[in-house]
Amino acid sequence: MSPLVTRTALALLAGCACAAHAADWSDTSLSYRYGTKFAEPFNDKDITKNIVNLSSVSGYKYGKNFFSVDFLMSSEVDPSSAGAKSGAHEAYALYRHTLDLGKVTGGSWAFGPVRGVGATAGFDFNSKTDAGYNSKKRMIVAGPTLMLDVPGFLDVSLFALWESNAPYNTFTGAATPRYAYKTHPMLTAAWGIPFNIGIPLSFEGFANFIGTKGKNEFGGDTARETNIDMQIMYDLSAAVGAGKNTFKVGIEYQFWKNKFGNSDANNPGATAKTPMVRAEYHF
C-alpha cells in the first residue's frame, strides 16, 4: 500500500474516532431484503439471496459519517464450496466520512444547485465463502463530494479507488496472493428524497460508475462497471403508531453491469437485473 493511501487511512480513522464522540444527530437502521434474480460472474443461474443490513449515519460539527454492513446469504446455486449443497455467505462493510469544507472554513461553498462541498474518504471490506473465488476485497476511497440542494439529500462524489483482493478457488485449491489493481476512478451518487402522493414515500439509492482497473489478478482485462441500486420506500410508521421514519417497506431494483469489473461478454452472470422487496426498522 502506498504512503498516500496509508496516510489517508490513518486520517480517516482519526476523524472517525473524533466524530464518534461528538455526533449531533444519528440514524441507525436494521433492514432485510430478498430477491430471486441475483447473479454472479461465471454462474449462469438465477441466485436467490436473503440480505440483512445494519447501517448508521450520523452528523457532527464538521461533517458526517456513514457505515453499512451487508450479510448476504445465497441459495445453493451459488455454493459455499465445490460440491456443497449449502449456499455462499458474504459480509460486505462500507464506511465513508465526509468533511464539510464550508463548516470547517466558516464560509459558504454553495454555487448553483450545490449547497456545499466536502472531502470524503472511506473503505470497503468484504469476505465471502463460496466455491470459485472467496473474495477478500480491501479498498480505500478518497475524493471530493458535492452536496446538492434538494429535499432530503443528494451527494455526488468523484473518488480514486485503491483496491486489492486475494481469492481462493476451492475447485483447484489455488490461492492467489493479494493483488493490487491499478488505481481507478469512480463517479458515485447517493440520495434519499422524500415525496408525498397522499402517502409518505421516499426515493432512495446509489449509483456507481467505475472505470477499468487494469489487468485482473489472472492477467485478463477488466471492464467498466455500473451498479445502480434504487428503491421506493413507504413510511408506515404512523399506521402502526410509531414515530416518523421508524418503519419502512418498499420495492428495490438493482442493475449491476460488468460486476466487479468482469465483462459480461460471453459471461451472462456478470450483469444482474434484480428486483427485491425491502423492510427497514430505524432506531
Where are the regions that the model predicts?
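Surface-exposed loop and membrane-interface regions of Gram-negative outer-membrane beta-barrel proteins
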Residues: S68-Y133, F218-E225, D264
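Transmembrane beta-strands of outer-membrane beta-barrel pores
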Residues: Y34-F38, F71-S75, A121-T129, A160-A166, ...
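Short glycine/proline- and aromatic-enriched beta-strand/turn motifs that initiate or cap beta-hairpins
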Residues: A22-L72
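Residues on the lipid-exposed face of transmembrane beta-strands in outer-membrane beta-barrel proteins
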Residues: L54-S58, Y95-L101, A142-L148, A160, ...
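Short loop/turn motifs that connect adjacent beta-strands in outer-membrane beta-barrel proteins
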Residues: H21-D27, V57, Y62-F67, L101-G118, ...
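Predominantly the C-terminal beta-signal and adjacent terminal strand-loop region
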Residues: A223, I232-F283
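Cleavable N-terminal export/targeting peptides
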Residues: M1-W25
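Residues that define the transmembrane beta-barrel architecture of outer-membrane proteins
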Residues: T48-V52, G87-A93, N134-I140, Y181-L187, ...
